[in-house]
Amino acid sequence: MSNNTRMDGLPAQPNLRVTIIAADGLYKRDVFRFPDPFAVATINGEQTKTTQVSKRTLNPYWNESFDFRVNEDSILAIQVFDQKKFKKKDQGFLGVINIRIGDVIDLVPDADDQMLTRDLKKSNDNLVVHGKLIINLSTNLSTPNRTQQTPSASRPSLLAPQTSTPNGTTDRPSSAMSSAVSTNGTPAASQPMPLAHRPASLASTTSTSQATAAATTSTTTATANGTPVQPRQVDVRQLSPFEDALGRLPPGWERREDHLGRTYYVDHNTRTTSWNRPTGTGQSDAEATQQAQRQQHQNRSLPEDRTGANSPTLQQQQAVAQAQATALVHTGATTAGTGELPPGWEMRWTPEGRPYFVDHNTRTTTWVDPRRQQYIRMYGGNNPNGIIQQQPVSQLGPLPSGWEMRLTNTARVYFVDHNTKTTTWDDPRLPSSLDQNVPQYKRDFRRKLIYFRSQPAMRILSGQCHIKVRRSHIFEDAFAEISRQSATDLKKRLMIKFDGEDGLDYGGLSREFFFLLSHEMFNPFYCLFEYSAHDNYTLQINPHSGINPEHLNYFKFIGRVVGLAIFHRRFLDAFFITAFYKMILGKPVTLADMEGVDADFHRSLQWMLDNDISGGIIEATFSTEDERFGVITVEDLKPNGRNIEVTNENKREYVELMVKWRIQKRVEEQFKAFKEGFNELIPQDLINVFDERELELLIGGIAEIDVDDWKKHTDYRGYTESDEVIQFFWQTVRSWDSEQKSRLLQFTTGTSRIPVNGFKDLQGSDGPRRFTIERAGDINNLPKAHTCFNRLDLPPYKTLEQLQQKLTMAVEETMGFGQE
């Protein structure tokens, strides 16, 4: 063998130690199962070693070392396979890296260790691969080669013959690089090896103590003759949760991973989380971000509430009306500056002192002074800018049949429709602010809102509900205050007081309260909610919230808070997956809803429905695996489901059961508690008048959208910004009001939420993803949205009118998102 070694130009003894540490973000090639990855390391296609198998993971951690004989021209190839599929045609290939040794390390005894992170590459089969591989190269072989062994781990059985040298290296006669590397490759030593460096994106969030213990690499070991030796300190070490590859985190910050392996940062000082690594100016940055979020939150509104940019608030209107009514009662005078009554009119007073007006021309009476002008705002149609117009009430004529005009106790006029038993602030004689040119959904949503808020169950009761909280402990204080009060008390006028702050709540304090509380309640820090796979700001219930033994009480409290915000016409700064809104409305979830939960899984299920799966293409049963805190259990989707195979005949039932389990069944207890609290304030029959997209707007409000910012951060495929159809598109968007823009944003991205820093921070299912308009489809087709990628497929319409018609119809009529 030594002669062959000299001919190959390789040393007689191993001179390089390769530590295969981990892989991150492997591709999930199987539809319903995670792979069992293992790695195969090869030098020039001759010396081959194999790691243990990591079970059911896309982020395997091996930390195994192997010694090789190399020179500067040697090529190190490390391939990753799925052990479940190793005997199949593609061998479960998950990626490969190729490294020329001389390019990365000097082959001298005192050379520094090299920690490498390389992207996995495709093979000749051109199969899709994802992820990175982390390895360490060292020329110091003075310490025994110790490979980590665990009882649950196993090595894959590779079928080709091999010859093992005494040091465990496998020599193969063929020098060709094979995608099917063949070895058993058991290393000579089997003592546990201290953990090497593990990158931030692979660190476990639940094993801090283990990581701390593993970081100690200077333990004393013994040689074969019993002489104690002190191994050299390894230059690379296990990163603690309080640092990452860029160094130490600021005081009070911790690095964690979510259920999808995405790294995020926890600020224990403020009990907040962030996707961005904190900097030295983190505190000022956090304050600036929160202030921007607060401003954005306070600018949200609903159609019924918007009567002009500078319109007074409801409290201001009531205060002015009350003052005017008081002046009329005490002085008997009319409104200042109104002049003489029109011919044929007379002002009289009721026994209580309230003025009313008699029109002798028509022999009718009214509470409204005919000299006053009624201001209305026209939406849509020929008045897109919402210009305020004036029209004398005296020229409107009598009310329609079945209608009655009344006054509130603050002298505000409203109208009763006895035909439908509803009330409205809008005078039915005035031109409707929702004329026939306005989309049907807008007319419906506003009328639904009027109906919803006019019902007896939604009226604020007499009295006051006092809630006192500390800003620094708003979650705990609000939980105690809201939980102790009855639903009846919570329906009284809300009076919020912040500890140590003097102020009267005329709406501003309660808006601030719901803003701050929503940031705390839905913070993943508390493990009650988690970010969806769709992006990093839409929320879903955390199926593992049971780690908190009081989690059901908290979910009932959160349900109360959401109901409280709707009841008192306040907004929460939180947005959920579409399926969550459908669950509140009692609607069944469908496969389309899975896209907002897990886009890859949605595509897998859709592929199953669209293709023939006979012949064992998919090895699945009516069961699924569920991992809770490291323990994997098998859950049946139906009785004895683990013994029922999925076929072409029953695959539709399987998909329905799988969707229901992924979205509903896993969080059934939590959602039941949420609904219990929610329905204490909001009756189910009333909330059911809305659909899921309207419910999102009802809870979160409608934001003012900066079209210039939207346009600035838009990409084009097949179009340029100067193309006529693109000009038509932005012209149409600018002509729409805030609600229509929010609907378009919902249609194209899946949510009406705008990132705090604007459209430049828009997220997709795979990270930051700018809004994109792509040229696709025939001009007779409607535009199509891909919500996971924030993409709009826009046909090249010839005229502005055609684009407006098609885009409006697509936004109005589409019931689900991402119809691909």
UniProtKB/Swiss-Prot annotation:
Q: Where is the composition biased (Low complexity)?
A: 200-224, 313-326
Q: Where is the active site?
A: C788
Q: Which residues form the WW domain?
A: 247-280, 339-372, 397-430
**Coiled coil regions in record:** none
Q: Does the keyword Cytoplasm apply?
A: yes
Broad class of the protein's primary localization = cytoplasm
Spell out the reaction equation it catalyses: S-ubiquitinyl-[E2 ubiquitin-conjugating enzyme]-L-cysteine + [acceptor protein]-L-lysine = [E2 ubiquitin-conjugating enzyme]-L-cysteine + N(6)-ubiquitinyl-[acceptor protein]-L-lysine
Give the record's keywords alphabetically. Answer: Cytoplasm, Repeat, Transferase, Ubl conjugation pathway
Can you say where in the cell this protein is located?
A: Cytoplasm
Q: What's a Gene Ontology MF term here?
A: ubiquitin protein ligase activity
Listed pathway(s)? Protein modification; protein ubiquitination
Q: Residues annotated as region Disordered?
A: 140-255, 270-326
Q: Where is the C2 domain?
A: 1-118
- Subunit structure and binding partners: Interacts with creD.
Biological function:
E3 ubiquitin-protein ligase which accepts ubiquitin from an E2 ubiquitin-conjugating enzyme in the form of a thioester and then directly transfers the ubiquitin to targeted substrates.
Name of this chain's protein: E3 ubiquitin-protein ligase RSP5
Q: Which gene encodes it?
A: RSP5
